[in-house]
Amino acid sequence: MADRLTQLQDAVNSLADQFCNAIGVLQQCGPPASFSNIQTAINKDQPANPTEEYAQLFAALIARTAKDIDVLIDSLPSEESTAALQAASLYKLEEENHEAATCLEDVVYRGDMLLEKIQSALADIAQSQLKTRSVTHSHSLPDS
């Protein structure tokens, strides 16, 4: 996973791409402008362009990307954050990490204990089945 600055740069690049695409679609689909002193030939056979749908699509994309950029900017450390605050935050994160590691070790230990019990039970079942088979096999043999 990329760091926050890389994510922010990617989001800004995505926003720039969306603006370029929106402008390109507007140029392609927009009706020609009329100039009073210049006569232009307008192709009357052009099909109706779904410019409203494009406008809504690009507006939604641009708005969502702008919100993503705001969230990424808000997640960056502020200038007000001093070294002492950062150290305290790191210390707290380390404590939480140690607590999680202890909890994980406990869960692994309990899992190992359960595994031993299950393996012991499976061994007992296998022994019982072997004994049962040997007893039934010896009873089924005809006497000579």
Curated annotation (Swiss-Prot):
A biological process term (GO) from this entry: positive regulation of transcription elongation by RNA polymerase II
Bridged cysteine pairs (disulfide): none
InterPro entries associated with the record: Med7/Med21-like, Mediator_Med21
Annotated coiled-coil segments of the chain: none
Location in the cell: Nucleus
Gene Ontology MF annotations: transcription coactivator activity; ubiquitin protein ligase activity
Gene3D superfamilies membership: Mediator complex, subunit Med21 (6.10.280.10)
Pfam families, per the entry: Med21 (PF11221)
UniProt keyword Transcription regulation present: yes
GO cellular component, one term: core mediator complex
Keywords: Activator, Nucleus, Transcription, Transcription regulation
Organs and tissues of expression: Expressed in brain, heart, kidney, liver, lung, skeletal muscles, spleen and testis.
Chief subcellular location: nucleus
Family: Belongs to the Mediator complex subunit 21 family.
Subunit-structure text: Component of the Mediator complex, which is composed of MED1, MED4, MED6, MED7, MED8, MED9, MED10, MED11, MED12, MED13, MED13L, MED14, MED15, MED16, MED17, MED18, MED19, MED20, MED21, MED22, MED23, MED24, MED25, MED26, MED27, MED29, MED30, MED31, CCNC, CDK8 and CDC2L6/CDK11. The MED12, MED13, CCNC and CDK8 subunits form a distinct module termed the CDK8 module. Mediator containing the CDK8 module is less active than Mediator lacking this module in supporting transcriptional activation.
Stated role: Component of the Mediator complex, a coactivator involved in the regulated transcription of nearly all RNA polymerase II-dependent genes. Mediator functions as a bridge to convey information from gene-specific regulatory proteins to the basal RNA polymerase II transcription machinery. Mediator is recruited to promoters by direct interactions with regulatory proteins and serves as a scaffold for the assembly of a functional preinitiation complex with RNA polymerase II and the general transcription factors.
Protein name: Mediator of RNA polymerase II transcription subunit 21
Protein's organism: Mus musculus
Gene that this polypeptide is encoded by: Med21
